Amino acid sequence: MAEDVSSTAPSPRGCADGRDADPTEEQMAQTQRNDQDQFECQELLECQVQVGAPDEEEEEEEDSGLVAEAEAVAAGWMLHFLCLSLCRAFRDGRSEDFRRTRNSAEAIIHGLSSLTACQLRTIYICQFLTRIAAGKTLDAQFENDERITPLESALMIWGSIEKEHDKLHEEIQNLIKIPAIAVCMENGNFKEAEEVFERIFGDPNSHMPFKSKLLMIISQKDTFHSFFQHFSYYHMMEKIKSYVNYVLSEKSSTFLMKAAAKVVESKRTRTITSQDKPSGNDVEMETEANLDTRKSVSDKQSAVTESSEGTVSLLRSHKNLFLSKLQHGTQQQDLNKKERRVGTPQSTKKKKESRRATESRIPVSKSQPVTPEKHRARKRQAWLWEEDKNLRSGVRKYGEGNWSKILLHYKFNNRTSVMLKDRWRTMKKLKLISSDSE
């Protein structure tokens, strides 16, 4: 998916360095967004007044199509809000918050049956930050091609986000290219550094003054050359954070943030103490309503995704893009092919159970740039898609129970025979044995 993704519509944003691409069009677009947000806020306030038990006749005549559309709109609000939270966690270096928000955004994307151009761009931003966060983890795989490093994948996604912007786009693009090579050299992978160089700078039509110098540095294996100081990892992160600040200022005007701000302002003006029971009841009612809505969104959209090939491809393609390692090798180009089917659809029940089973999976990375803290050693290691595939192949060849033989003939990541046995039992319970596409 990280290859040249055909955008469904031009980005409605101005230049990322603060300049307006087209003042007239930008102002018109902003006015339309503000009008739409104001309309949505008014609709929300009117709906709050009407909250109550529905009449039996209304309940019987409920328009399922209207409900599905309303849930899709709400999911879009949550997606934009989670993108904001992800940006803040990335900027502030809060690794645990980044991971939790990433997983929440992933869950929202699971339920999207279609994408607007704005939602697609929002997803690209989340994917880009996820790759950057895993930039120094060379074994983190985001593409079908196992050779592609996280920063290379981020570079390809970046080309899909900001192509129309010149200055900031070019600066970040160059600042990603050099660290992508430097990270390999820092890990002693000089052969891999040469391969990354060829993939990034191999275009004969590209004219960059430092290409020959960089190639010489790689051949000399000079990891600490002064050249890398001008294109350091730190400078790359700082420049990306400046872009993140731009996204935060842009998306702070989204509907959900405006509605939340109005609620906060209203509560402040009432000057109610923390021990005021009516206020507490109001908050509880709002929370319960939100939880009910969220549950409805999850149930309805899961039903929609099961019957739509395009939705299934979106679900499968975006899931691995948020995790630090690729779990479904055939999913990456789904969005590139405009939501065409690549994987096999999974049942709604299996999706929900699988999602619960993977919620606690945390990528292990000693040098993840967003993580100032060390991961706890007690965190369980996530099972990769390749490991599940090898386990299924091993059982087919040697039979269930021959775990030692399967472990000997297939590649697993520091697993034991007991782990294979437990994983097989889990896969059978979650119905992952024959439904996953290989």
UniProtKB/Swiss-Prot annotation:
Region (TRFH dimerization): 58-268
Residue ranges, annotated region (Disordered): 1-36, 268-311, 326-375
InterPro entries reported in the protein's UniProt record: Homeodomain-like_sf (IPR009057), Myb_dom (IPR017930), SANT/Myb (IPR001005), Telomere_rpt-bd_fac_dimer_dom (IPR013867), Telomere_rpt-bd_fac_dimer_sf (IPR036507), TERF1/2 (IPR017357), TRBD-Containing_Protein (IPR052450)
Chain location of the short sequence motif Nuclear localization signal per the record: 337-356
Any single GO CC term annotated in Swiss-Prot or TrEMBL for this entry: nuclear telomere cap complex
Disulfide bonds: none
GO molecular function: ankyrin repeat binding; DNA binding, bending; double-stranded telomeric DNA binding; G-rich strand telomeric DNA binding; microtubule binding; protein homodimerization activity; telomerase activity
Pfam families given in the database record: Myb_DNA-binding, TRF
Cross-link (Glycyl lysine isopeptide (Lys-Gly) (interchain with G-Cter in SUMO2)): 213, 325, 366
A GO biological-process term: negative regulation of telomeric D-loop disassembly
Start-end of DNA-binding region: 403-428
Keyword Transcription regulation assigned: no
Biased composition (Polar residues): 1-10, 299-311
Residues with the N-acetylalanine modification: 2
Job description of the protein: Binds the telomeric double-stranded 5'-TTAGGG-3' repeat and negatively regulates telomere length. Involved in the regulation of the mitotic spindle. Component of the shelterin complex (telosome) that is involved in the regulation of telomere length and protection. Shelterin associates with arrays of double-stranded 5'-TTAGGG-3' repeats added by telomerase and protects chromosome ends; without its protective activity, telomeres are no longer hidden from the DNA damage surveillance and chromosome ends are inappropriately processed by DNA repair pathways.
Protein name, entry field: Telomeric repeat-binding factor 1
Species, as recorded: Cricetulus griseus (Chinese hamster)
Lineage: Eukaryota, Metazoa, Chordata, Craniata, Vertebrata
Protein's gene: TERF1
